[in-house]
């Protein structure tokens, strides 16, 4: 928000679409960014578009002293591969959102579109020495550079 406000105040520049990229999420593709922008350009009713990783696991949250299964509307007990996926939000990899959303103090608006992606490196999000070590191993041993995979 600070950068958007600064551009408006100091450069009299207002962008229709703001792209958010988290520096700790290294292994994104250029198409992730392009796809998020393209979705907003083609769908003016949308507030935000971001990449999300489909997952077929069961998720639970603690509610007081008990645990509640999330997405309880998805049948339980079927093989994971046959289940309707949930989507893990990956806005750090690629998010495009509208100016008004950012100015309201949020990254995501109410009306969002998720671009599904599967990337074996998406779990790498640098927040510890171990995360940095994993990233360095991928770069040195697999010759995969940040923002290219």
Which role does the model predict for each range below?
Residues 115-149:
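Hydrophobic helical membrane-anchoring modules
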